Structures are given as structure tokens and as C-alpha cells.
Amino acid sequence: MPGAVDLGTGVYVPGQELSRAYLLAGEAALRGGVTCVVVSPSPARPAITCADSLREHRRAAAGAAVPVLFLGGVTWGTTPLDLADLQAAGAVGFSCSLSDGGAPDTAALGETLLRKVMAELTALDSVLLVHAEDAAELGSAQGPADQRLPRAERRGLERVIAAARMAGTRTHVCPFTAAECAALLE
């Protein structure tokens, strides 16, 4: 029977051991018809930004009810060697944010680093998942309803598309919510 793949799952339960968090996440996924989860590097603790933390997560996920795959987190401090090490340790792709990575150790990437990372990931034949909101356009939004301004997503998506075209990087934008951005993908 076919099932869904949850791309970018956040696995973190405050106060629980990591293995327990994976057990709970796997059971919840299976109940919802999800047969594979791809874990986002954040809000995981430790954040999946180096090979050692990825190995820790892989061990903890060994008892999950569904197959678990992992994304490596790209941050301002990520080097080409870090990317290669994460891939060698089992990262099936990488994830970053242009505005807020969800945790201090997965902070937003600037334009120059985004382009460098994309070039490295193209060389590694890997994929990059990007939370594409332009941080400057977000300003000081207050509350969840104000945080996903369509123009912020459009500007972020424009930056990601330009960088991906230049580097040839396979890129997935997530989440994607502003209907006006669909025309950019044609």
C-alpha cells in the first residue's frame, strides 16, 4: 500500500531522550499514512549540522516505526568539508533558510554563502531544501499571521532561483505558500 513521505520532519520532544522522540515521531507518522520521514536539521537537538550529530540521530532513529532519512543543516559556518562529511555520514540532502533556520545553530544564510553552498552541493550531486523568505522583507513581524509576507517569499524565491540557475543545483523550496510566486516557477 502506498504511503506519503514527510519531507522536513521536525523531531524534538523537550525533556525526552532522542530515541524516544524518534519512536513517537515514527508511530505518529505511521498512524497518519506516512511511510518515510526525512528529518530536518532543526529543531532537532543536537541540530544536524555535523557528521557526529547526524550519527547520533541515526542511532536514535534505529527503532522508529518508519524509515528515517536525514537532511544536513547548512549554516553560516558550514564548510565544503562539512557538507562532504555530512553526505558521507548519510545525509540525503541539505537544508537552509534565508530568514530564520528555526534555531540559533541553523541561522539564516546570506546571498554569498547561499551561492557558494549551491556550487558545492552541485559538485556533490546533492539537493538543497530552502526556506525562501527574504529576511530584510520580513522586518519585525509580530505573530504567526504576519510572518509569511508574500513579498518576502517572492524576493527569497527570486534569490534562490537565480542562485540555483547559476550553480545548477537541484533545489526544493519549502514551505511554499504565496500564490503569487507560482509564476516565478514557470
Task: Label each residue range with its predicted role.
Residues G33-V38, A64-V68, I161-T171:
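Short, surface-exposed connector motifs at secondary-structure boundaries
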